[in-house]
C-alpha cells in the first residue's frame, strides 16, 4: 500500500530591522551616552541576516535549521521582555498561508508573541514538508519529522490562544496537530503492512488501522463541528479537498481494520462474525470510494492510494467466506457488528516541545547574553536578590560553625597550654634528675600563674571600683541634663534612653564576673592564691619517677607522642577548615545564575524556589566537609583529654589514700572555679573599655550641649543689658516726656543662629580626653562635631535587627550595645545638632 500526505504551505512575511529596533530601545532606556555599552552591532546584524535566511528559498533542511535557530533567539528575547516586548516598537507583518479562500490575508502586530508563533508555524510546516520528501525513500524516516511537527502544533494550540491570524488560531493549529498525528500513524501502519506476511499480523494490523481511523475521525469532526455543509466548497480552514481526503482515509482504514479483524475471527472459527465484519469492510470501502470520486478533478491521491485494488481484495474475501458459511458452517451473521471493542494502539511517540526547540535555545544562550545584555527584566533582578539572600544565609551558617569550632580549638589550646605541657612532660620523664612533682599539679601551677599574671596586669581587676566609676559618670551626666533648657527636651530624652540601654548592657557585663569576684580577688593576690592551692598539695607525697618501672615510663612517653600527634591532627583540621571556608566564599562570590533565571523567567515562584534549592546543592559538599572537621575536632579533643588523664594516673604510681584522693578532688574543684573566673574576667576585660569609652563620649556630648545652652543664655542677657542703656531722645528736654529709658525687649534664645564669633576663644575642651578618644570642639558658629560612629558592618546590623538574639551570643558579647551607632547618630538630635 502507498499513500500521500496533505501538503502544507509556509507563511510569508515582510522585512524587519532588528538592529535599528534594539539600538532605539537601548537609547531610550540607557540614554545617548551609555546605550552603546550594551549594543553589539555585529551580532545585531547577524540576527537580521538570520531572519532573512529563515524566510528565504533555501532547501528544506537548511531552511528548517535557520528557522529553529531564529526561534531560539526569539525565545531568549521573550524571556527577557515578556509582555513588555511592545517596547521594541517593531511592526511584525505576516501573511496567512495560501490555503483556500482565506489564504494571503495580511496581519500586523507589535507583540513578540506574534513573531514567535508565526515562526513556529513555519517550523511545523517545514517538518511536515520534510516528511513528505522523505516519504519517497522510507516511511520509517518520515515518521519522526511528523511527530516533531505534531509537538509544535500542539504547543501552539495550547499556548497561542487569541491570535488574529487564521493560521494561528488555537482550533486550527489543533486540527493540524491531529492531522499530522493521523498521518504519522498511517505511515507506521503502512510500514507494517508492506513489511510482508500481513496475514500473520492481522490482530496487530486491526488495532493499528482502527487507531488510524479514529485519528482521522477527529479531523472529520473538526469540519462537522464548524457546521459546514459537506457539499459546500467553503471549509473553516485549509483547502476544500482536505475534507474529502480525511473522510476517505477514515473510511479506508475502518475498512482495513474490519478486514483484518475478520481474518482473526475466521482463524478462531467464528465464521458468521467474520462475514459480518467483511460486509462492514466492503461498505467502508464503498464510502471511501465515494469521497475519492470527489477528488477526481484534483488528480489527488489517484496514483498513491490503490482504493480499487483494496476494495477488490475485500469483496473477493467476502464472497468466498460467505459462500463457505452458506454451504459448510451455517454460522449466524450478526447485523449490528462493531469495532468499538477493538483496543487502540497509538504507535507515535510525540516528543516534548522543549526537546524540539531546547537545543537551539541553549545554543543561542551565549550569543544572546551579549546581544541582549542590556535587556534584563526586573523580575530577574528581584529573584537574583532572593537567591543571593539564600546564599548569604547558607554562608552565614557555615561561617558561624567555623568560628565556633575555631573558638573551641583556641580555648582548649590556650587553657591547657598544650604545646608547653607536652614538652614539660616529655622532659620530666626523659630526665630522671628533674623535679618529681606530680605532672598534673605542675600543669595546674603553670596555668594558675598565667591567669594570675593576666589579672594583676589588668587595669580593671577591681570590679567594685569599675562599677563605682560608671555610676559616678552616669550621675554626672544626669546632673548636666537636669540643667539643660526645655528647648532641648527631645535630645535629653534620647540621651536618657541611651543611658537606659547602656545600663542594661552593664548589667549583662557585670553579671558575668560578679559570681567570681572572690576568685578574681584571689588571682590578684599571689600570696593568698598559693597558700590556698598548697593546702591541697602538702598532704600528698610527690611521686618519684624512679618508682616508675621502664615499661610504665615507656608507656607514658608513648602516650605523650600519641597526644602530640593528636595535637598536630588538631592543627591540620583547623587549617583544612580555614581552606574549605575560603573555597566556599570564593565559590559563593563567583556564583551567578542570571542566565538560568532568564531561561526560567516564566516559571512560578514555587518552581523558582525549587531551582534555588537545586543551585544551592553545589555548596552542600563544602558544608559537609566543614561538619566533618568539626566532628573530628571534638573527638580529637576528647582523645587528648583522655590521654592526659592517663599520663597523670601513670605518673602517680603510689596508691593514694582516701585523704589524698579527697585532696586531689578538692584541688581539681578549686582549679575549675579559677578557670571559670579567668574566662569570665577575660570577657569582662575585653568589653569594659567599650563601655567606659561610651560613657566618656556621652558625657562630653552632654557637657557640650549644657555649655552651649549656658553660653546662649549669657549672650542674650548681655545683649539685653547693653540695649537697656540706649536712649532715642535728641535733647535733655525730651527726658521729661520720657522719664523711663526705652529698652529692647528680651530676645528668646535662637538655636538656629550662630553665637558671636568673639566667644570662640573661651571654649576649648580638647584636653578632655579619655581612653584615647579626642573630641575637638569647633567654633560655636558651627554645630558641635559628633564622635565618629563605630562601624558595625553587616553582621552588626543583623544582630541589632534580629529580635531573637541567642543567649549564647549575649554571653559571648554582652556589650554589643556599645557597638551600635546609638546616641552618636546625628539624626537623633533635632535641635542640638542643628
Curated annotation (Swiss-Prot):
- Amino acid composition bias (Polar residues), ranges on this chain: 812-822
**Per its UniProt entry, which superkingdom is the organism in?**
Eukaryota
Q: Which organism is it from?
A: Eremothecium gossypii (strain ATCC 10895 / CBS 109.51 / FGSC 9923 / NRRL Y-1056)
Principal cellular location given in the protein's record: cytoplasm
Q: Which GO terms describe its cellular component?
A: endosome
Q: Which family does it belong to?
A: Belongs to the BRO1 family.
Function field: Involved in concentration and sorting of cargo proteins of the multivesicular body (MVB) for incorporation into intralumenal vesicles.
What residue spans carry the Pro residues bias annotation? 742-757
Know the name of this protein? Vacuolar protein-sorting protein BRO1
Coiled coil region boundaries: 551-590
Pfam families named in the record: ALIX_LYPXL_bnd, BRO1
Where is this protein localized, as stated in its record? Cytoplasm; Endosome
- Biological-process GO terms, alphabetical: protein transport to vacuole involved in ubiquitin-dependent protein catabolic process via the multivesicular body sorting pathway
User: Is Coiled coil one of the keywords UniProt gives this record?
Assistant: yes
The UniProt entry, under InterPro entries, shows: ALIX_V_dom (IPR025304), BRO1_dom (IPR004328), BRO1_sf (IPR038499)
Lineage start: Eukaryota, Fungi, Dikarya, Ascomycota, Saccharomycotina
